[in-house]
């Protein structure tokens, strides 16, 4: 990605008093960005987990990976980065990044490091400080910022690129906002549709599964309290603490006889059949996963074999 250089769009110097922010004025983006929903879900999950661990909202930092063809950039995935704060300045752990880079290149060979992300509001000088560190890894990285605390209905995501502007006679790094589009694959559409369906009818606090489990829990809790009340009455009547009520005892006896007998041969046969079905489903899942692993291994072996064969043929041309 070529670095963009501008001087307020017209070669004029920028007055710091007029533009105290880190945003460049009158600069158009040099690239087009396609953002996948998986990236937004990853960032949101990262922020929620850290907030749950720390007990308060915290800023999170991570890396963006994807593909680039000329001026077209497709941000497809992301992973978390380690950082520490020294004298109120964030420092990225580059050794951790290089380790993660080796790992994701083994899985996503066709993807490359495109930039970084963080959470918060409007970009500030601390973001520029981190962006300069990322610039030491790749040239002109993207910068994505998600605001998880916003109350607006629009997608709270902004994408930026760095530009060099003249501020008070000095070359200064500023940020220029980029427009982006959402790009989805089939698996992402299914996942996003599932998340949307879970919260479409409610306030967003409970999913459909959670509401179903809460209803079942309430029913079982009520049943348990009623059974315990009957049991306490029978024990008290047997101990002579309360008078016998034959009508209540007959209803309790009839209720007990309504329960299925769990020691019959038919129950055992049905129980074993169900256990076998569950075990078979588990085995089928394991076999499917093993077949997928074997398929990936064969594909990699064939690629390696083809490369070695091409190398031998190329060497044969010179001997």
From Swiss-Prot:
Gene3D superfamilies: Cytidine Deaminase, domain 2. Residues 33-166 form the MPN domain. The keyword Iron does not apply. It comes from the Eukaryota. GO terms for biological process: protein deneddylation. GO terms for molecular function: metallopeptidase activity. Keywords: Cytoplasm, Nucleus, Signalosome. Signal peptide: none annotated. It is found in: Cytoplasm; Nucleus. One of its GO terms (cellular component) is COP9 signalosome. Pfam families: JAB, MitMem_reg. Component of the COP9 signalosome complex (CSN), a complex involved in various cellular and developmental processes. The CSN complex is an essential regulator of the ubiquitin (Ubl) conjugation pathway by mediating the deneddylation of the cullin subunits of E3 ligase complexes, leading to modify the Ubl ligase activity. PANTHER family: COP9 SIGNALOSOME COMPLEX SUBUNIT 6, EUKARYOTIC TRANSLATION INITIATION FACTOR 3 SUBUNIT F-RELATED. Belongs to the peptidase M67A family. CSN6 subfamily. Component of the CSN complex, probably composed of cops1, cops2, cops3, cops4, cops5, cops6, cops7, cops8 and cops9. This is COP9 signalosome complex subunit 6. It comes from Xenopus tropicalis (Western clawed frog).
């Amino acid at each position: 990605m070529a670095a963009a250089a501008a001087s307020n769009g017209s070669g004029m110097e920028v007055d710091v008093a007029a533009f105290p922010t880190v945003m460049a004025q009158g600069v158009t983006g040099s690239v087009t960005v396609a953002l996948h929903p998986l990236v937004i879900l990853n960032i949101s999950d990262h922020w929620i987990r850290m907030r749950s661990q720390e007990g308060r909202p915290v800023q999170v930092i991570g890396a963006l990976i994807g593909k680039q063809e000329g001026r077209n950039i497709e941000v497809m995935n992301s992973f978390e980065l380690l950082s520490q704060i020294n004298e109120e300045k964030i420092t990225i752990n580059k050794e951790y990044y290089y380790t993660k880079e080796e790992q994701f290149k083994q899985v996503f060979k066709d993807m490359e490091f495109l930039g970084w992300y963080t959470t918060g509001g409007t970009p500030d000088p601390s973001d520029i400080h981190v962006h300069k560190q990322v610039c030491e890894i790749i040239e002109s990285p993207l910068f994505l910022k998600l605001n998880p605390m916003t109350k607006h209905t629009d997608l709270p995501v902004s994408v930026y690129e760095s530009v060099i502007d003249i501020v008070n006679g000095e070359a200064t790094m500023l940020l220029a906002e980029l427009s982006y589009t959402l790009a989805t694959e089939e698996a992402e559409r299914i996942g996003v549709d599932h998340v949307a369906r879970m919260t479409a009818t409610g306030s967003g606090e409970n999913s459909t599964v959670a509401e179903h489990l809460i209803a079942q829990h309430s029913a079982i809790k009520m049943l348990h309290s009623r059974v315990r009340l009957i049991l306490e009455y029978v024990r008290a009547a047997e101990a002579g603490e309360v008078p016998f009520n034959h009508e209540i005892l007959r209803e309790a006896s009839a209720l007990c006889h309504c329960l299925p007998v769990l020691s019959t041969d038919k129950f055992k046969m049905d129980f074993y059949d169900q256990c076998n079905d569950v075990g078979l489903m588990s085995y089928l899942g394991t076999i499917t996963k093993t077949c997928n692993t074997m398929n990936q291994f064969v594909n990699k072996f064939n690629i390696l074999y083809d490369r070695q064969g091409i190398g031998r043929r190329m060497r044969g041309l010179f001997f």
